[in-house]
Amino acid sequence: MDRRDRIGDNLMKPCETSTQGALVSINGSETEGTFPTLTTSRLSLREVLPSDAPSLFTVHGDAEGMRWFGTDPMTDIAEADKLVQVFADWRRSGSGVRWAVERLSDGLLLGTCGLFRWNRKWRSCVVGYELATFARGNGYMREALYAAIDYGFDVMQINRIEAQVHPQNAASIQVLETLGFVREGCQRQAGYWRDAYHDLLQFSLLRSDCVRRG
């Protein structure tokens, strides 16, 4: 049996005290040229497909729900089609992987998450994610990130995962801190969207953080 099929037994977990959202299985591997589908107790993290564009447009077109995401809200379905292509290009170029977060109970797309800006020499990357407004408050993104980060540390052999979050995005900050991310500082006016500059908080999670706390 491949060690990735025994994910619940031996592989390193993110720095979280609860086991909810533990990665159950991996099918495929980015390092082996096949898209890695991750499964948790409630979610399937799978490849983002062209057929997902309408759902992505619904998520990204929600101006209030996406106000801290870092881009202007979508106004045309063509923008969602382009985003699907961007995620596919990440994989082809080897710069990262983006998963569609799908609820197992009904196959509904809840959002996406991923690891990108993958610097293989430095063993670092950035984590990004977004969740539909209707799905928030249920721990879905924490569960999805738990699996994605586990994959990053074990399969991609990442040492440092970074995240940038708007200071007013309290829910996202809470998710990161629950997973063990450490706040490193504030990047002043590092982002620009909706005709305004925005400060961004810098977070990181190291492999050694999990070893010390694990």
Predicted regions and their residues:
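Acyl-donor (CoA/ACP) binding surface of acyl/acetyltransferases
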Residues: 2-67, 98, 102-214
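Conserved GNAT-fold acetyl-CoA-binding loop/helix
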Residues: 64-86, 97-99
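A generic secondary-structure signal
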Residues: 86-87, 151
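Short loop/turn motifs at secondary-structure junctions and domain boundaries
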Residues: 89-95, 181
